[in-house]
Amino acid sequence: MRVLLAALALFSLSACQAAPHDFPASAKAEFNRGCPSSDSVCECTWDELTRAMTYEDYQAAVDRFRREGLMDPRITRARTHCIERKHA
């Protein structure tokens, strides 16, 4: 019985997501220029990004992508998660 309760508690905690970090409206507007809010994958990706990264981390990742063409793995994971969820 204890094992079952422990497993249930762990499962419940794993389902919890962190609250979104604060991002300025201009960051979302910039994101939506390339990924429209009318697309459910884009909206999901934005939600995942704001939970996984601070605005400062996100901006650094965008700057790095523009400068070096390298995508931050957290952005890739967020988008992949949303694409897979849409087609699941």
Where are these regions (language model features)?
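Positively charged n-region of N-terminal signal peptides that target proteins for export
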Residues: M1-V3
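C-terminal motif of bacterial Sec signal peptides marking the signal peptidase cleavage site
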Residues: S12-A15
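Short amphipathic alpha-helix starts
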Residues: H21, A25-A27
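Bacterial signal peptide processing site
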Residues: Q17-A19
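Membrane-interface starts of transmembrane alpha-helices
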Residues: P24, S38-C42
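Intrinsically disordered, glycine/charged-rich N-terminal periplasmic/extracytoplasmic linker segments
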Residues: N32, E43, D47-A88
